[in-house]
UniProtKB/Swiss-Prot annotation:
It comes from Treponema denticola (strain ATCC 35405 / DSM 14222 / CIP 103919 / JCM 8153 / KCTC 15104). HAMAP family: Ribosomal_bL25_CTC. One of its GO terms (biological process) is translation. This is Large ribosomal subunit protein bL25. Gene3D superfamilies: Ribosomal protein L25, beta domain, Ribosomal Protein L25, Chain P. Disulfide bonds: none annotated. Pfam families: Ribosomal_L25p, Ribosomal_TL5_C. NCBIfam families: bL25_bact_ctc (TIGR00731).
Amino acid sequence: MEQRLLNANERSTYGKNAAVKMRKAGRIPAVMYDRHGKSVPIDVDEREFMKLFKLVTESTIVTLNAAGKDYEVFIKDFQHDIVSDKIKHIDFYEVERGKTLRTKVKIRLEGSPEGVRHGGILETGITELELECLPKDLPARIIVDVSALDVNQSLHVRDIKLPEAVTVLTSDDITVAAIKFAAAESTTPAATEGEETEAAAAAPEPAAEDK
């Protein structure tokens, strides 16, 4: 289990104006949803969060310290401003240690497929798996090596090896990656308009019917 630390402050100010002031002060407004579903308004330091954000995935457990108490959470959602390229708001969800959870984990393909060197094209299927396990057993990401994949071969969910403590809920026959040849283009060139006219002129006229 990959785990990181992030400090947070509980906040008592709400609304758009308060959020704008907070961001100007270098803080990001956020909400933590605890294990009982209760929402706790918090804010985090922008620089500290962005350093963390570059190192984690959606399945990384973060230790969130707020008001002197530690919470084990996921970064479940965030709002991104495409103009300023900054994070505007974050949603954290608490997980309960020792209790099974269900979540989706990203798949990352690695390696240069054998089939691509033979003229094939790598086609990707699903990009994440739904898993069930204890928080301590949850992988941050799923690495799949496609180096040995040759032309007309596929890799499915059932081919991915995970620890015994992790249960895969995604159907095992779904394709993760495949190597296929590009569709062959027709080698017969289409006749141009001029060629069609010349062909029509050269064709013999039908014999006149007897009256």
